[in-house]
């Protein structure tokens, strides 16, 4: 048979292949000439599952415990499938429940059998909890195809897939570029969003036989396909997998701060595959039809408890997260499906936008599966809608990287009927930003660096700043004022002392205001007021991108809004001391701009801070802060000049 192909240093499956989002629920390649029904090419179900009860009937395996969870899992596969050839897939991790998840890929003659996996789950006690198996057990090819090389070249496979599926790809004059021993890339094609690739692999067929195939990957936007073309018959496609999950979400779309700013819409596939390549409904191990995935898990939590995995969450089989909601509906539990869906949507968009701005796996972001990109996985955000542990508030708990964050969105009783915090995006964004700032200030492994009164206040201010920047509208100018929490609190004044404004007569807060403040939200209002000044200075200089994502040039956002958000985010890791004060945070923002743009915006930044008393001469003393409207000498500036 075949020797074990498992050793340290073996190449893992490419990252895009590890992405296994929910297969498309649509039946055709819409918009293509002579539409093709993809259901004809779905893979057959071949897997088996051995649960814990069944494992306990196999004492020799159930009690097996030796070494790390990877070693235990490897030994199980050896014992269960003796003499099989396989390799470790590099997407293993330990989840928040303490269960280790390990996956193996079967190989034959050193070539992957692409639909033959063995996944093992190891419990907290180090013993095998359960496993799943789809290994191929039929007859093996008598010879290594790489020796005879009696199969078509990959270019023929690309043309075969293009013709069979009627894909809008042109490959005349394209060339083949080697990527690895069994994988190539096609350069010079048109019609695809990225260069198509082809990988030689086996496919276990429904009839029990094995087929050598070219797995041709083509991203054409509405469909991102893995097409398994027979390597010997150019007109035969065995299977097709579509990475694009066609899910719909009925929500207040990104940019609407609360229900007063617009109507709900039905959005199709709202995720960004560059920042959430597994989509929002998969984690690389599992595909979900409920509000859970790699970045977040959202559910109803009426008792306010800490257990959440078995709580109710909407789970439409057709992936249509479309539920009725009106602010006049009462009681709130009657629209819990809409509430959970909205909270899940807003939090996932936060993940995707913040990822673009720098909150990645290495920086300690919130993901179950980090896909080999660094950081610690196993830490999506737990999203509790209509949490019963409180009212008239929301909060976010941020443990170190590798442990899930937790957001609690409460019912607010200041209106009749009560209002649900899930529908105020400003509240959700504010809370999610706590996770961002706590992970970045002090590093992913230390979530204790925003606990002093002034640093804690800045944590609140950063949350307000991002929520306010995101809600800016196309017609807004520096004369536009915004309140925080107006809708959910049923108050035109919102939940802060003053609106965010560049008009000192509307919002008079300055650095020395902190001398009379001893509450973090109040101090945070001072900090965000300063950042709001900087934001508009940068917008006036660079313009404002009103789209949902930034446009970069050499890693720098081209507009002032996203540039301000990027500089503020970059500043957090630059803050050297734990629990920084306003002066140190201001300097970190200047340093971040110097690193990002070579200091091209220091004038605008200095003017924004100096206008509200955090100029060159500002000094920190916890009981007697000294304010300053001075800027460096090269910038002539009057304190209240815009």
From Swiss-Prot:
Cofactor note: Binds 1 zinc ion per subunit.
GO molecular function: metalloendopeptidase activity; zinc ion binding
Glycosylation, residue list: 287, 595, 624
Chain sites annotated for binding Zn(2+): 430, 434
EC number: 3.4.24.-
Entries under PROSITE patterns matching the protein: ZINC_PROTEASE
Propeptide: 20-246
Main localization, broad class: secreted
UniProt-listed GO biological process terms: proteolysis
Subcellular location: Secreted
InterPro entries, per database record: FTP_domain (IPR011096), Fungal_virulence_M36 (IPR050371), Peptidase_M36 (IPR001842), Peptidase_M4/M1_CTD_sf (IPR027268)
Signal sequence residues: 1-19
Top EC class of this enzyme: hydrolase
Pfam families: FTP (PF07504), Peptidase_M36 (PF02128)
Catalytic residues, chain numbering: 431
Role summary: Secreted metalloproteinase that allows assimilation of proteinaceous substrates and probably acts as a virulence factor.
Family note: Belongs to the peptidase M36 family.
Cited PANTHER family: EXTRACELLULAR METALLOPROTEINASE MEP (PTHR33478:SF1)
Full protein name: Extracellular metalloproteinase 5
The organism of origin for this protein: Arthroderma gypseum (strain ATCC MYA-4604 / CBS 118893)
Name of encoding gene: MEP5
């Amino acid at each position: 048979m075949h020797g074990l192909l498992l050793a340290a240093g073996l190449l893992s499956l490419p990252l895009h292949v590890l992405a296994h989002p929910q297969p498309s629920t649509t039946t055709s390649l819409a918009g293509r000439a002579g539409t093709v029904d993809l259901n004809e090419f779905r893979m057959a179900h071949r897997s088996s599952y051995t649960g814990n009860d069944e494992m306990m009937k196999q004492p020799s395996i159930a009690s097996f415990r030796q070494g790390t969870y990877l070693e235990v899992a490897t030994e199980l596969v050896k014992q269960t499938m003796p003499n099989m050839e396989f390799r470790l897939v590099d997407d293993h991790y330990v989840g928040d429940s303490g269960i280790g998840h390990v996956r193996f890929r079967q190989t034959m003659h050193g070539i992957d059998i692409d639909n033959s996996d063995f996944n093992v789950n190891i419990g907290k006690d180090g013993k095998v909890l359960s496993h799943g198996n789809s290994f191929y057990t039929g007859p093996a090819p008598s010879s290594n195809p790489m020796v005879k090389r009696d199969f078509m070249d990959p270019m023929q496979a690309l043309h075969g897939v293009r013709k069979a599926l009627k894909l809008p790809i042109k490959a005349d004059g394209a060339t083949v570029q080697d990527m690895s021993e069994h994988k190539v890339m096609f350069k010079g094609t048109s019609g695809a969003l990225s260069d198509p690739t082809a990988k030689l692999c086996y496919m276990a067929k429904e009839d029990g036989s094995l087929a050598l195939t070219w797995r041709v990957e083509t991203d054409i936007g509405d469909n991102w396909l893995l097409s398994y073309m027979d390597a010997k018959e150019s007109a035969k496609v065995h299977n097709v997998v579509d990475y694009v999950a066609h899910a719909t979400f009925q929500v207040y779309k990104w940019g609407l701060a609360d229900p007063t700013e617009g109507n709900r819409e039905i959005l199709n596939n709202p995720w960004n595959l560059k920042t959430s390549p597994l989509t929002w409904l998969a984690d690389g191990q599992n595909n979900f039809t409920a509000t859970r995935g790699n970045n977040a898990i959202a559910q109803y939590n009426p008792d306010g408890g800490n257990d959440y995995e078995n709580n109710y969450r909407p789970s439409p089989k057709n992936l249509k997260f479309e539920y009725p909601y009106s602010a006049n509906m009462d009681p709130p539990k009657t629209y819990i499906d809409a509430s959970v869906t909205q909270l899940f949507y807003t939090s996932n968009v936060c993940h995707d936008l913040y990822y673009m701005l720098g909150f990645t796996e290495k920086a300690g972001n919130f993901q179950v599966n980090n896909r080999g990109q660094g950081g610690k996985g196993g830490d999506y955000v737990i999203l509790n809608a209509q949490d019963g542990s409180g009212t008239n508030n929301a909060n976010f708990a941020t443990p170190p990287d590798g442990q899930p964050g937790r957001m609690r969105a409460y019912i607010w009783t200041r209106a009749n009927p009560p209002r649900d915090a899930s529908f105020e995006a400003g509240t959700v964004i504010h809370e999610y930003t706590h996770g961002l700032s706590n992970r970045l200030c002090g590093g992913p492994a230390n979530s204790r660096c925003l606990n002093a009164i002034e640093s804690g206040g800045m944590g609140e201010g950063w949350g307000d700043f991002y929520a306010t920047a995101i809600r800016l509208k196309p017609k807004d100018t520096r004369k536009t004022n915004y309140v925080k929490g107006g809708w959910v609190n049923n108050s035109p004044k919102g939940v802060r002392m003053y609106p965010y404004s560049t008009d000192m007569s509307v919002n008079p807060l300055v650095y020395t205001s902190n001398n009379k403040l001893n509450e973090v939200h109040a101090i945070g209002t001072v900090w965000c007021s300063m950042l709001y000044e900087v934001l508009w200075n940068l917008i006036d200089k660079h313009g404002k991108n009103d789209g949902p994502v930034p446009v970069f040039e050499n890693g720098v956002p081209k507009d002032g809004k996203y540039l301000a958000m990027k500089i503020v985010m970059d500043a957090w890791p630059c803050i050297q001391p734990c629990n920084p004060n306003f002066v140190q945070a201001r300097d970190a923002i200047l340093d971040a701009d110097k690193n990002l743009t070579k200091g091209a915006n220091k004038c605008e930044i200095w003017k924004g801070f100096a206008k509200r008393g955090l100029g060159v001469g500002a000094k920190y003393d916890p009981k007697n802060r000294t304010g300053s409207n001075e800027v460096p000498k090269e910038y002539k500036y009057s304190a209240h000049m815009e």
